[in-house]
Amino acid sequence: MRKIWLYTIALLVGGPAYAEPIKTILNCPFSDGTHALLLATSTLEGQKLFLKVDGNIQSAFSDMPNSDFVGQIVMAKCVASGLIFALNYGTPYSKGVLLRKNPISHATERIDFSEKALPRWLYVGRKQMRLVIPNSGYEVAAKFLIYDFVNAKGQPEEVEGVDTLPDKLGFKVLRLK
């Protein structure tokens, strides 16, 4: 019994000394020549993600700052002068972010998403970006879910459900998966 007690105390005191440092998972160039770094620390439960943009490190999921998302990375890509990633933090949902700097204004733009399926298409325009995700959860009666970001307006509160893929006019369309 004494050995168990001593072992427990050693773990509590020495545990933080064994914490893994932040590692760079991906380094993606933006259109203005700067970079976005996806960073992670590893724990027993999985990975906790961070972003480094313009020299500042912050939690990857700034849309929910009081939540601590830990899980497995299921998507991480440099795409269209930006970064997209997703973390499976518990069945069945994945939470992710699409991040870029606008090619005209050089302002940082982001789309936060959380769905059962991963994004399949990225529509990139000079003033807008759009993620298209297959609707596998059917919380809305639609085949696809659209996450939008419009320059100067930001990301709408609600996700749009549609039955056909959006028009490609004015966009470069990239297949993500």
Model-predicted segments: where are they?
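N-terminal signal peptide c-region/cleavage motif recognized by signal peptidases
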Residues: 14-16
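Mid-chain, structured segments of secreted extracytoplasmic proteins
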Residues: 63-102
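N-terminal, post-signal-peptide region of Sec/Tat-exported proteins
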Residues: 42-78
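Acidic, small-residue rich beta-repeat scaffolds with periodic aromatic anchors
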Residues: 5, 20-43, 120-177
